[in-house]
Amino acid sequence: MGVRECPALLLLLSLLLPPLGLPALGAPPRLICDSRVLERYILEAREAENVTMGCAEGCSFGENVTVPDTKVNFYSWKRMEVEQQAVEVWQGLALLSEAILQGQALLANSSQPSETLRLHVDKAVSSLRSLTSLLRALGAQKEAISPPDAASAAPLRTFAVDTLCKLFRIYSNFLRGKLKLYTGEACRRGDR
């Protein structure tokens, strides 16, 4: 018995899945366009930043971790092609994911890592994976792979951090800045 033969079952599933927090069948893959979704990730990043602010012991990496520069020149950003914005966001997200994973490994190798720190780093790893999936559904990866003029694309600006606090500050700033600007514009365009 297929789905076409049982429309009542399909209707029942489409009514039950959303209240459970599961995507409904045929639901558009634009979850990131719901501002509450991105705000949840931003809130988690800020919580992690706040937890690590007062941390001295166990928060230093002992080596530098490369992160994307989160500064945004709004005039330049508005004039940038959406494909170039996607490249910056995608590269920044990849670099942040790498940095958080590196931080996770360094934390695991420390003598006595705090359970709270480990929890926030693990949450960040999970959140970055989810954000990557949400951006894929929005089409950011496709835009980032084929920018109109790849030769003229400026390299991603980066710098190094040596503490969890600085890493989480960059993570929070990236989500509130470039990622939020890009998703807002991509969702407004609505041609996905």
From Swiss-Prot:
GO terms for cellular component: extracellular space. It comes from the Eukaryota. Disulfide bonds join C33-C187, C55-C59. Glycans are attached at N50, N64, N109. SUPFAM superfamilies: 4-helical cytokines. Keywords: Disulfide bond, Erythrocyte maturation, Glycoprotein, Hormone, Secreted, Signal. GO terms for biological process: erythrocyte differentiation; erythrocyte maturation; erythropoietin-mediated signaling pathway; positive regulation of cell population proliferation; positive regulation of Ras protein signal transduction. The keyword Repeat does not apply. It is found in: Secreted. One of its GO terms (molecular function) is hormone activity. PROSITE patterns: EPO_TPO. Residues 1-26 form the signal peptide. Belongs to the EPO/TPO family. Hormone involved in the regulation of erythrocyte proliferation and differentiation and the maintenance of a physiological level of circulating erythrocyte mass. Binds to EPOR leading to EPOR dimerization and JAK2 activation thereby activating specific downstream effectors, including STAT1 and STAT3. This is Erythropoietin. It comes from Equus caballus (Horse).
